């Protein structure tokens, strides 16, 4: 998942 701040989770 790509978060709203641009980090992969």
Curated annotation (Swiss-Prot):
Its EC number is 3.4.24.-. Inhibited by EDTA and 1,10-phenanthroline. Not inhibited by beta-mercaptoethanol, benzamidine and aprotinin. It comes from the Eukaryota. One of its GO terms (biological process) is venom-mediated fibrinolysis. GO terms for molecular function: metal ion binding; metallopeptidase activity; toxin activity. Binds 1 zinc ion per subunit. One of its GO terms (cellular component) is extracellular region. Keywords: Disulfide bond, Fibrinogenolytic toxin, Fibrinolytic toxin, Hemostasis impairing toxin, Hydrolase, Metal-binding, Metalloprotease, Protease, Secreted, Toxin, Zinc. Its cofactor is Zn(2+). It is found in: Secreted. Expressed by the venom gland. Contains 7 disulfide bonds. Snake venom zinc metalloprotease that has fibrino(geno)lytic activities. Hydrolyzes the alpha-chain (FGA) and more slowly the beta-chain of fibrinogen (FGB), without affecting the gamma-chain. Preferentially hydrolyzes the beta-chain (FGB) of fibrin. In vivo, shows a low edema-inducing effect. This action may be attributed to degradation of proteins in the cell membrane and consequent release of inflammatory mediators and leukocyte infiltrate. Monomer. Belongs to the venom metalloproteinase (M12B) family. P-I subfamily. Negative results: is devoid of coagulant activities on bovine plasma. In vivo, does not induce hemorrhage on mice back skin when 50 ug of enzyme are intradermally injected. This is Snake venom metalloproteinase BleucMP. It comes from Bothrops leucurus.
């Amino acid at each position: 998942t790509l978060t709203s701040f641009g980090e992969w989770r």
